[in-house]
Swiss-Prot record:
Provenance organism: Serratia proteamaculans (strain 568)
InterPro entries hit by this protein: CmoA (IPR005271), Methyltransf_25 (IPR041698), SAM-dependent_MTases_sf (IPR029063)
Record text on subunit structure and interactions: Homodimer.
HAMAP family registered for this protein in UniProt: Cx_SAM_synthase (MF_01589)
Protein's job: Catalyzes the conversion of S-adenosyl-L-methionine (SAM) to carboxy-S-adenosyl-L-methionine (Cx-SAM).
Name of the protein: Carboxy-S-adenosyl-L-methionine synthase
Annotated keywords: S-adenosyl-L-methionine, Transferase
Residues annotated for S-adenosyl-L-methionine binding in this entry: 39, 64-66, 89-90, 117-118, 132, 199
Family stated for the protein in its record: Belongs to the class I-like SAM-binding methyltransferase superfamily. Cx-SAM synthase family.
Length: 247
């Protein structure tokens, strides 16, 4: 059983900005399951997408890998030879635990876990790249640059999976889905205090975009095709494809 997230169950006098530190890493599996509707579905489907898109003798990238859930899902489903998964996160606490999680499962596809800024990672010979709830934590000015790097590094026929919390141009729809997400967290045992304190810590560091903004940026980066393949309330995932037959 994962450690239960009780980080914000008592009042915190001075709330700083959110960081993926040791305390968060320790309870992260419980936190994300109880906070992100559809998370388990996204993780399992990323594995199915890997079976479809990962090409022989190519690289697979999990950028902002946290504890490696997407990496493990892809590794379980990769059926071709000569692949290597590169999992990257800038949180030392996440990287340490991710390495332990990866080492606990045997598989043919090797995984390299790197502690680094994902903007500094050279994407090359990639058939699949995953950004699972990562882009929203980058400065908006850096987002297009990262997606351009991903596009350049993808092989023809390669895929990017981009999962995010969405904002909405229609205020009424945005309010409805915000409230449904609030209900989801309450139903999973979070108190009003926990919800409000976490939201206050995240508001300056997690800056969300609309689906339309994501699609526009993906097109600017070079992707010929992009569409939402999964959504639950204000959370979802897009797939973006680089045209051309797989090599």
């Amino acid at each position: 059983m994962p450690n239960r997230d009780t980080l914000f169950s008592a009042p915190i006098a001075k709330l700083g900005d959110w960081t993926f530190d040791e305390r968060v890493a320790e309870v992260f599996p419980d936190m994300i399951q109880r906070s992100v509707p559809g998370y388990s579905n996204i993780i399992s489907m990323i594995g199915m997408l890997a079976e479809r898109f990962v090409q022989p003798d190519s690289q697979v990238y999990d950028l902002g890998c946290s504890l490696g859930a997407a990496t493990l899902s892809m590794r379980r489903n990769i059926k071709v030879a000569g692949c290597n998964i590169i999992a990257v996160d800038n949180s030392p606490a996440m990287v340490e635990r991710c390495r332990r999680h990866i080492d606990a499962f045997r598989a043919d596809t090797p995984v390299e876990v790197i502690e680094a800024d994902i903007l500094d990672i050279k994407i090359e010979n990639a058939s699949m790249v995953v950004l699972n709830f990562t882009l929203q934590f980058l400065e908006p000015a850096d987002r297009l640059r990262l997606l351009e790097q991903v596009y350049r590094g993808l092989r023809p026929g390669g895929a990017l999976v981009l999962s995010e919390k969405f904002s909405f141009e229609d205020a009424d729809v945005g309010e409805l889905l915000f409230n449904m997400h609030h209900d989801f967290k309450r139903a999973n045992g979070y108190s009003e205090l926990e919800i409000s304190q976490k939201r206050s810590m995240l508001e300056n560091v997690m800056l969300t975009d609309s689906v339309a903004a994501h699609k526009t940026r993906l097109k600017q980066a070079g992707f010929e095709h992009a569409e939402v393949w999964f959504q639950c309330f204000n959370f979802g995932s897009l797939i973006a494809l680089k045209s051309g037959a797989a090599a």
